[in-house]
């Protein structure tokens, strides 16, 4: 008998049930009931007027449900057993400690970000190497540009303590153009140069250096020429005779020699951007092309050269040697300051101008000059040979030393 809802059993033409391959009767799927279609109302071609609802709005009271309080979740820290590491033979019982595991991270170990300084150190090493090579090349180039002269006399005094430099400022016009001569007020060519500045820098093994000024009109013995002004030795015998004259007059052995001319001094001042000086009184000297007021001010090359050359003051040459010491100390302080050395636009012009205008002894080099500059920058004691009187001789007006005071000063430097 057919079950309701499952369809009738299919039969063949003889009325026998049709079986599937498993021996089960095959049922005929019932046909779905056909629903008559709903008649469709044709659209009306008209516009309806919107009628708002006249129902008053529903008044809903606010919900007075208190906020739900959720207790904090108490999660115990996860206990992770220590990881056993492979042990080499002979290391039984030694367990390598493991880094702690942070609770809540699911036991996953985060890879720490490690800073590897190899690249940074390599860059720094490369920059330092390039800098050292550059310094080495510039040093050799500067040393090759120095003018050298034989300033060591054949006979020298006995060796004295420390190191002594003979520093000379000459009024040579060599290398100056007509425009430079007019700008600097140096006058025309005078032939063999004379020394406007004679100083001895004594650098002891310990303690501060001493910068000793020797007035150029000092009345001293010039070997082979007799008594004369100190600067006459340079005129008649050059650096070698001047060195010998200073050694015999002071008893100090001269180890190094350095000389700079007018043009070189002015160019160095301009290269470092000027030097600040503080004259105590106004100064006017048309022969030195100088016209400055009292007070602190910045000198360019022309003003600086006139400042160290002029003798238009009350004490003449004695005032000048004091100004020369002050100026050279200020110049070296400016030239060796970080603002100059770290500025390539000042350092290279300064070196270029300095090496071309400096004259040094045969055995002197640019590194000796660098040590000289650093010694003077660190603080120095300034002295002038004591003068007893002035007198007129056949060589002109000269300065007579105070023999006792001069000897005491020289002895302190030997």
UniProtKB/Swiss-Prot annotation:
Residues 33-42, 54-80 have a biased composition (Pro residues). SUPFAM superfamilies: beta-sandwich domain of Sec23/24. Belongs to the LytR/CpsA/Psr (LCP) family. Residues 1-108 are annotated as: Disordered. It is found in: Cell inner membrane. InterPro entries: LytR/CpsA/Psr_CW_biosynth, LytR_CpsA_psr. It comes from the Bacteria. This is Probable cell wall biosynthesis protein LcpB. Residues 142-414 are periplasmic. PANTHER family: POLYISOPRENYL-TEICHOIC ACID--PEPTIDOGLYCAN TEICHOIC ACID TRANSFERASE TAGU. One of its GO terms (cellular component) is plasma membrane. Disruption phenotype: Deletion mutant does not show any growth-related or morphological phenotype under the tested conditions. It comes from Corynebacterium glutamicum (strain ATCC 13032 / DSM 20300 / JCM 1318 / BCRC 11384 / CCUG 27702 / LMG 3730 / NBRC 12168 / NCIMB 10025 / NRRL B-2784 / 534). Residues 9-23 have a biased composition (Basic and acidic residues). The chain crosses the membrane at residues 121-141. Keywords: Cell inner membrane, Cell membrane, Cell wall biogenesis/degradation, Membrane, Transmembrane, Transmembrane helix. Induction: Transcriptionally regulated by IpsA. It is a single-pass membrane protein.
């Amino acid at each position: 008998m057919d079950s309701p809802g499952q369809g009738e059993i299919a039969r063949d033409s003889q009325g026998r049930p049709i079986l599937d391959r498993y021996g089960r009767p095959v049922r005929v799927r019932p046909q779905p009931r056909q629903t008559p279609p709903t008649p469709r109302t044709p659209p009306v071609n008209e516009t309806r007027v919107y009628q708002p609802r006249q129902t008053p709005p529903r008044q809903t009271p606010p919900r007075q449900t208190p906020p739900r309080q959720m207790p904090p979740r108490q999660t115990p820290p996860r206990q992770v057993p220590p990881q056993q590491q492979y042990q080499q033979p002979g290391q039984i019982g030694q367990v390598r400690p493991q880094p702690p595991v942070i609770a809540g991270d699911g036991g996953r170990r985060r890879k720490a970000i490690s800073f590897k300084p190899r690249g940074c150190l390599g860059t720094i090493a490369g920059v330092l190497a390039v800098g050292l090579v550059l310094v080495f090349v510039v040093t050799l180039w500067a040393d090759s540009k120095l003018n050298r002269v034989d300033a060591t006399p054949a006979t020298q005094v006995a060796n004295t303590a420390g190191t002594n430099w003979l520093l000379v400022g000459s009024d040579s016009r060599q290398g100056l153009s007509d425009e430079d001569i007019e700008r600097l007020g140096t006058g025309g060519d005078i032939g063999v140069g004379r020394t406007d500045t004679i100083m001895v820098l004594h650098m002891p093994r310990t303690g501060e250096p001493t910068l000793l000024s020797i007035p150029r009109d000092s009345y001293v013995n010039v070997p082979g020429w007799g008594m004369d002004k100190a600067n006459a030795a340079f005129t008649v015998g050059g650096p070698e005779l001047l060195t010998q004259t200073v050694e015999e007059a002071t008893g100090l052995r001269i180890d190094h020699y350095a000389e700079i001319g007018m043009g070189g001094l002015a160019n160095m001042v301009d290269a470092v951007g000027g030097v600040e000086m503080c004259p105590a009184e106004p100064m006017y000297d048309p022969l030195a092309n100088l016209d400055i007021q009292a007070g602190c001010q910045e000198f360019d090359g022309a003003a600086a050269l006139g400042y160290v050359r002029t003798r238009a003051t009350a004490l003449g040459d004695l005032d000048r040697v004091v100004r020369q010491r002050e100026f050279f100390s200020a110049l070296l302080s400016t030239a060796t300051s970080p603002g100059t050395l770290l500025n390539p636009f000042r350092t290279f012009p300064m070196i270029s101008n300095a090496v071309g205008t400096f004259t040094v002894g045969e055995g002197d080099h640019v590194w000796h000059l660098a040590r000289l500059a650093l010694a003077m920058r660190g603080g120095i004691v300034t002295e002038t040979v004591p003068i007893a009187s002035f007198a007129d001789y056949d060589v002109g007006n000269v300065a007579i030393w105070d023999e006792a005071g001069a000897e005491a000063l020289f002895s302190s430097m030997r």
